[in-house]
Amino acid sequence: MGVHILSTGSSVPNFSVENQQFEDMIETSDHWISTRTGIKKRHLAPSSTSLTKLAAEAANKALYAANLKPTEISLIILATSTPDDLFGSASQLQAEIGATTPVAFDITAACSGFIVALVTAAQFIQLVYDNILVVGADTCLDGLIGQIELPVFYLVMVLEQLVLGQSLKNSILGFKLCTDGQLNSHLQLMNKPVNNQKFGGTEIPHGNYNSITMNGKEVYKFAVFQVPTVIRQCLNNLNISIDEVDWFILHQANTRIIEAIASRLSVPFSKMITNLEHYGNTSAASIPLALDEAIQSNKIQPGQIIVLSGFGAGLTWGAIVLKW
C-alpha cells in the first residue's frame, strides 16, 4: 500500500512585523537583516492566540481540501518545539477539531520536526492507519525578546497541516533521517535549574529554560555540507538524477544557506522554493508552509519530483523525495 499526500492547509497570524520595527529594540537594521538572512518580515501571534487554535484552523482547511471529516482521521502527529502544553498539544488539537477517534502525539525535532513527523506518519500508513494529520507548528518564544542570543528577528508563528492517506499511488519515493549528537551544542535551548529547594542536605532544582544559543558559523557549515549529501544519497538510492528533480523545498532558515546548498548541488536557485522574505524562519512549519503555497499557486504540478530537506537542532537533518 502506498502513502499518498491528500491535501495541505496553513494558517498564519494576521499580525506581521517588518525589519524596521526591530531597530528601536535591538542593535540592527533592515539592511543588515535582509542581506544576511533574506527575511523582510515575519508573522507574530498576540497573547490571545494559541498554537492549538491556529493549528485547528489549518487542520480544517486541509481536511476540507481532502474531503474528510475530523472523525475520519486515525492519527494526529504534531511536530513542534513550542507546544501550548509541555506534555503535548496534539491531544488539544484533537479536541479542538472534534476528531474523537485518533490517537495524537507530539514530536520534537526542532527545524527538522516536519520531516521526522512525515516519515513517522508514512510508517503508520504502511500498517493499519487510513488517514493521518501531520502538523508542523511553532510559535514566537514568549518573553525572550531582548534576552535571546539567537537574533530576535527569527521568531515567528506559523501553522501547517498535511493529510496522508492509503493509496495505490505512492507520493513518498524515499527518505533518509540523520542525527549527530556530537554537534548538539551548536544549537540549543537548555534547561536551567532555578529556585533550588533543600531536602535535608540535598538541593532539588526547579527547572526553567535558558535563551536559545547558536554557533552560526558551525550551523552554516553543517547545513551546507550535510543537506546536499543527504539529498544526493536519497536520489542515488532511487536512481533519480539531480536534473530530474523539479523542485527543492528546504528548511527556510536563511537565504545564504539555501543559495550555498543550491550551488553545491549544481542546480539553479530558481528550483529552490522559498518564502523566507515574508515569514522568516518558521522552524517545523517552514517546509510544509512553502509546500502549501507552491501547491496553491499551481507551481507544483502532478507528476513532478520534489525534494524536501530539513535541518536543525540535535543536530538533525534529513530528506524526503516525493512524486506529486
From Swiss-Prot:
Q: Does the keyword Acyltransferase apply?
A: yes
Q: Where is this region: ACP-binding?
A: 252-256
Does Transit peptide appear among the keywords? Answer: no
Where is the protein situated, by its record's location annotation? Plastid, Chloroplast
What chemistry does it catalyse, as a reaction equation? malonyl-[ACP] + acetyl-CoA + H(+) = 3-oxobutanoyl-[ACP] + CO2 + CoA
Q: In which pathway does it act?
A: Lipid metabolism; fatty acid biosynthesis
User: What is annotated as the active site?
Assistant: C111, H251, N281
Coiled coil (residue ranges): none
Q: Which UniProt keywords apply?
A: Acyltransferase, Chloroplast, Fatty acid biosynthesis, Fatty acid metabolism, Lipid biosynthesis, Lipid metabolism, Multifunctional enzyme, Plastid, Transferase
Q: What class of enzyme is it?
A: transferase
Superkingdom of origin organism: Eukaryota
Similarity annotation: Belongs to the thiolase-like superfamily. FabH family.
Description of how the protein assembles with itself and partners = Homodimer.
Alphabetized PANTHER family for the sequence: 3-OXOACYL-[ACYL-CARRIER-PROTEIN] SYNTHASE, BETA-KETOACYL-[ACYL-CARRIER-PROTEIN] SYNTHASE III, CHLOROPLASTIC
Official protein name in the record: Beta-ketoacyl-[acyl-carrier-protein] synthase III
Question: Per the UniProt entry, what species is this protein from, by scientific name?
Answer: Pyropia yezoensis
User: What gene does the UniProt entry assign to this protein?
Assistant: fabH
